[in-house]
């Protein structure tokens, strides 16, 4: 008897980045731009000697490593881990606003809900039976 079924969320149950047109319609920057801005602002708030460019570069390095882990190693590092890695590349530990930064990154994925992939709305109730 099947007791549980699991699914990959992005591009299986929902369409990744399908919320971007809704963000644009609301005059919001992309999630990528917003994440970068939030990270750079948090770094500069506590380490004003770090240039915005250097902070953005550290974040990009951490995100590149994340991409490798996700696509090659089939592992999804949590947001907090990715941000800690970016801070470590700057020689920093978690900032006083670290938890709020993590929450902002995570909440961004659900504040404007992504679109369900075709057939998902019909499939999930059928599987629940």
Description of each model-found segment:
Residues 2-117:
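N-terminal helical cap/lid subdomain that shapes the substrate entry/recognition surface
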Residues 119-129:
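Catalytic-core regions built around general acid/base machinery
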């Amino acid at each position: 008897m099947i007791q549980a079924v699991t699914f990959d969320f992005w591009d299986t149950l929902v369409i990744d980045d399908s919320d971007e047109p809704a963000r644009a319609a609301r005059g919001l920057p992309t999630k990528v731009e917003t994440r970068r801005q939030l990270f750079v602002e948090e770094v500069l708030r506590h380490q004003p000697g770090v240039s915005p460019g250097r902070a953005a570069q550290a974040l990009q390095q951490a995100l590149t490593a994340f991409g490798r882990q996700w696509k090659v190693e089939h592992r999804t590092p949590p947001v907090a881990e990715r941000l800690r890695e970016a801070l470590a590349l700057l020689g920093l530990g978690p900032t006083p606003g670290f938890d709020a930064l993590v929450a902002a990154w995570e909440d961004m994925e659900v504040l404007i809900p992504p679109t369900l992939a075709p057939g998902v709305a019909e499939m999930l109730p059928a599987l629940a039976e």
